């Protein structure tokens, strides 16, 4: 076959996603909320095999309203290489290269990795060939009003070190030095190498694109830290020997469980 879902599977997907969206966001039926805040898998009968799970097929990025999120870093300009939105210092330790991507859709220029990057969202890129850590200082921020730590991450196409996918640790540290760690792959299926044929130029157009999907980690995963007085967050790339990722929208969010 052509690799596409059958008409019957496509219909089942549409029925679930369209109906549950309206029943939750318009009808207020709370039992559908967990699907739309990324906290549970879709029903197995929505999966192509009819049983599931199939979390790697349906990737949800939750971006709460402004009143329900605290932006740590939106990576909107080169200042994000040194300072986050809270005014805290940003540090890149051990990376072979890093920088900011300022693209504007087509022709996909403006990023030193994953060329072309068809995206209008500014983002950071980080490449490593030994253990490396991104650290963002939180200046004692109080996170008790939030439930989820989120960051949007794309596994960069064009880097053969990424072909088996990527993984990284997320570390929260409080002002007393207590640290707690969560493994990204325990909370997302999105860290895979972009599928498809490579895009070369306007006449040789493949479908391969780097897409930034949310990694949403409940704060309950970080046991033993004082959420009233957080010092820093770290993204530790020590699960694979090498790779490249693109990152944006590091935020704390309130979601409706």
Model-based region annotation:
Residues 126-224, 237-257:
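Extracellular ligand-binding interfaces
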Residues 227-236:
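Short, surface-exposed ligand- or partner-binding patches at beta-edge/loop junctions that are enriched
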Residues 1-137, 144-150, 245, 253-257:
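Alpha/beta-hydrolase-fold serine-hydrolase catalytic core, especially in secreted/extracellular enzymes
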Residues 4-5, 200, 233:
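A near-ubiquitous, low-amplitude feature marking generic local secondary-structure context
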Residues 28-32, 223-228:
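Substrate-binding/catalytic groove segments of enzymes
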């Amino acid at each position: 076959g052509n690799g596409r879902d059958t008409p019957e599977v496509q219909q089942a997907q549409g029925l679930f996603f369209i109906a549950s969206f309206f029943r939750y966001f318009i009808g207020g039926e709370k039992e559908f909320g967990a699907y739309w805040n990324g906290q549970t898998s879709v029903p197995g009968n929505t999966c192509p095999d009819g049983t599931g799970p199939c979390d790697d097929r349906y990737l949800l990025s939750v971006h709460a309203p402004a009143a329900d999120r605290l932006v740590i870093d939106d990576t909107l300009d080169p200042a994000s290489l040194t300072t986050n939105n809270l005014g805290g210092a940003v540090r890149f330790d051990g990376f072979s290269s890093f920088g900011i991507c300022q693209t504007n859709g087509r022709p996909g220029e403006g990023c030193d990795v994953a060329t072309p990057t068809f995206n209008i969202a500014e983002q950071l890129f980080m490449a490593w060939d030994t253990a490396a850590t991104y650290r963002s200082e939180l200046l004692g921020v109080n996170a008790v009003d939030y439930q989820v730590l989120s960051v949007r991450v794309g596994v960069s196409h064009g880097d053969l070190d990424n072909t088996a996918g990527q993984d990284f640790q997320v570390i929260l540290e409080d002002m007393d030095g207590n640290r707690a760690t969560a493994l990204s792959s325990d909370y997302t299926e999105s860290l895979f190498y972009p599928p498809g044929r490579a895009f070369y130029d306007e006449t040789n157009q493949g479908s391969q694109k780097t897409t930034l999907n949310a990694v949403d980690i409940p704060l309950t995963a970080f046991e033993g830290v004082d959420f009233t007085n957080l010092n820093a967050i770290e993204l530790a790339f020590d699960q694979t020997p090498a790779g490249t990722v693109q990152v944006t929208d590091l935020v704390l969010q309130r979601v409706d469980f």
